């Protein structure tokens, strides 16, 4: 073996060692640890406070997403009744969209800017950051709402903080709304459900079309949207039955009228 080949072999070994160290330092030792998600948060109330991490995103006094939407499909989280108090729940809170619309009290005690007083937030979006068993990525407005009066901006500068949360019954103060999504057509129904008091989240949607005596289950599409694909035209008026996570069933007779149109909201009476 020549001197040149020996030197080249040494260079190759050094490169391999450098790559291995870079992987260990950059991939395994840097950044926050990956924490597995906690157990799913179900429709139980009056429970003790649970620990979580809180972060925030979007504009400091905004609603979170720039388009006022999010992973639940809502398009108005900056308006009442959400009032920019939206939260991205991690896996056991968002639950692949089945947690959309559920309500939580949140509070923080540290840092000093925290008021310790609970405020209500709504699950409107998702996050998959593995920084804690439970993680709320809050709209800037919602994060600041945990602060003492006048200390909102200082609290937001803290970035990641410890917080406590518990599930509460929703009191939207608005009528249940059924929004037919833009892509709907006579053979395809995509229904966004929002403002459901009580549990807030929906686990089943069944519809009864004009002339039918039986309910047909819709398929969960994504977020708070449920759908039906049909070989025949879907005829109104349509009665909708909602089932919440706690098992409450509510029927909305003929809430979607004959001649229904895409990109239109229909409100329960």
Swiss-Prot record:
Among the record's GO biological process terms, what is one?
A: plant-type cell wall loosening
Expression by tissue, per the entry, reads: Expressed in pollen.
Q: What role does this protein play?
A: May aid fertilization by loosening the cell wall of the stigma and style, thereby facilitating penetration of the pollen tube. Acts selectively on grass cell walls, which are relatively poor in pectins and xyloglucans and rich in glucuronoarabinoxylans and (1-3),(1-4)-beta-D-glucans, when compared with cell walls of other angiosperms, including other monocots.
Q: Where is each Expansin-like CBD domain found?
A: 187-268
The record's subcellular location field reads: Secreted, Cell wall; Membrane
Q: Show which residues constitute the signal peptide.
A: 1-30
Q: Which UniProt keywords apply?
A: Allergen, Cell wall, Cell wall biogenesis/degradation, Disulfide bond, Glycoprotein, Membrane, Secreted, Signal
| Superkingdom of this protein's organism | Eukaryota
Q: Which gene encodes it?
A: EXPB11
The protein's name in its UniProt record: Expansin-B11
Topology in membrane: Peripheral membrane protein
List the disulfide bonds in this chain. Answer: 72-100, 103-170, 108-114
Predominant place of localization: secreted
Q: Does the keyword Mitochondrion apply?
A: no
Attached carbohydrates are found at 40
Q: Which organism is it from?
A: Zea mays (Maize)
């Amino acid at each position: 073996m020549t001197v040149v080949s020996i030197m080249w072999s040494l260079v190759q070994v050094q490169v391999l060692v450098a790559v291995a160290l870079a992987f260990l330092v950059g991939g395994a030792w840097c950044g926050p640890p990956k924490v597995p998600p906690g157990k799913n948060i179900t429709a139980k109330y009056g429970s003790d406070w649970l620990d979580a991490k809180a972060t925030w995103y979007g504009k400091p006094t905004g609603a979170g997403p720039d388009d006022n939407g999010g992973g639940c499909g809502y398009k108005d989280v900056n308006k009442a009744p959400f009032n920019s108090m939206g939260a991205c729940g991690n896996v056991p809170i968002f639950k692949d969209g089945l947690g959309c619309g559920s309500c939580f009290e949140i509070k923080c005690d540290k840092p000093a800017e925290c008021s310790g007083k609970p405020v209500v937030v709504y699950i409107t979006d998702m996050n998959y950051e593995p920084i804690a068993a439970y993680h709320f990525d809050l709209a800037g407005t919602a994060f600041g709402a945990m602060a003492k009066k006048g200390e909102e901006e200082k609290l937001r500068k803290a970035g990641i903080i410890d917080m406590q949360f518990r599930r509460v019954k929703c009191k939207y103060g608005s009528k249940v709304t059924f929004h037919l999504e833009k892509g709907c057509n006579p053979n395809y129904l995509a229904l966004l459900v929002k403002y459901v008091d009580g549990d807030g989240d929906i686990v089943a949607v069944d519809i009864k079309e004009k002339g039918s005596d039986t309910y047909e289950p819709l398929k969960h599409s994504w977020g708070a949207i449920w759908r039906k694909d049909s070989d025949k035209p879907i005829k109104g008026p349509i009665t909708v039955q909602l089932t919440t996570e706690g098992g409450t069933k509510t029927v909305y007779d003929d809430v979607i009228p004959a001649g229904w149109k895409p990109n239109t909201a229909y409100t329960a009476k």
